Amino acid sequence: MNSADPSSTESISEPSFLDCWYLTGATASGKTGVGIELAQRLDAEIISLDSMALYREMDIGTAKPTAQERQCVPHHLLDVLSPRDEFSVSNYLEAARRMMIEIHSRGRQVLFVGGTPLYLKALLRGIFRGPPADWEFRRAVEEELKESGLPALYERLQQVDPLSAAKLHPHDKRRIIRALEVHRATGRPISHLQTQFEEGRPAESCHVFALLWPRAVLHQRINRRVDEMFAAGFVEEVRGLLQRHGTLSRTALQAVGYREVIAHLQGRADLATTIEAVKARTRQFARHQETWFRSLSECRFVPLQEGSSGQEVAQQILRAGSGVGR
C-alpha cells in the first residue's frame, strides 16, 4: 500500500479530506466574508484553516471571525489553545479529522477557511509519520543559536541532509531546526521521507479555491487592516497576554505582529515604527502565502478586483466547483 496516497489507511490524512471544500488566500484577502457566503450556499460548517486562530485571547492580531460572523455559520477550531500551548501540523490534522467526521455525521458539508499553507498541503496530501516535536531538543538548539548563530546550524543540515538544505533558505530557522530534529530522531533525512507526499491532484478534481487580488490592492488592504488592528487595541491585547501568561509559546509567537508589538512594549521601538514594521512583515507573509498556493496543483485562483462582493465571489466559486467529481 502506498503511504503517500491520501486514501490510504496508513496516511494521517483521511480520504474524505479530499471531498471537502477549501477557501484560502493571502492575509487580508477577504476569506472570512466570502467563506460565510459560500458556507451558507453549501449548507456547510466552517473549520478554521488558520494556525494562529487556534489560540484564545489572540483575537485582534489574528483577525478572527467576530462573534456576529460566527453566528451566521458554525465555526470550529477557533480559541481551542492557551497562548502558552505548542501545536504541530500533526495535532491540527487529528483535530480537523475529528471535527470533519462530526460535521459529516450531521449531514452537512465541510468548508475549510484560512490561509495557513502547511495545513492546507497536509489536508490535501497527508504528511509522513515523522517523529513528534521534541521541545527539549528545540530548546537546546535555541540556546546553541545564541552562541554559534544560524549559519552554523544551516551548515550542520548541509552535512546530514544536503537535499533539504538546498531547498531551504539559510535563514529559515524553523524548518532547518525541524529537519535536524527529524534526522536526530530517525537517522534519515527528512527530504527522503517527504518525497512521497509531493504529488498533488489536478485542480479540476478538487474544491480548492484561493482568492487573488492585484498586488497593489492587496497591499492597500493589508495596510488598512493593520491600522484598524492598532486602532482596535492590538497593543493592549498583547500587553494583557504578557501580564496573564508571562510569555507566549514558540508557535503562538509565529503570529504576524506579536513579536513587533512585544518589542514596542519593551521600549525597543516607538508605536509608529512598530505599525510600519507590522505592515511590512504582513506584506512579506502574504507573498509567502501566494508562493505556496501557486505550488499546489490542487489550487484554483479566483481573481478579484475592487468592488467584488462576497456574494458574487461565493457564487462564482460555487459555479466553478459544481462539476468536480461528476
Annotate each predicted stretch with a short phrase.
Residues 1-326:
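Phosphate/pyrophosphate-binding catalytic cores of soluble transferases and nucleic-acid-acting enzymes
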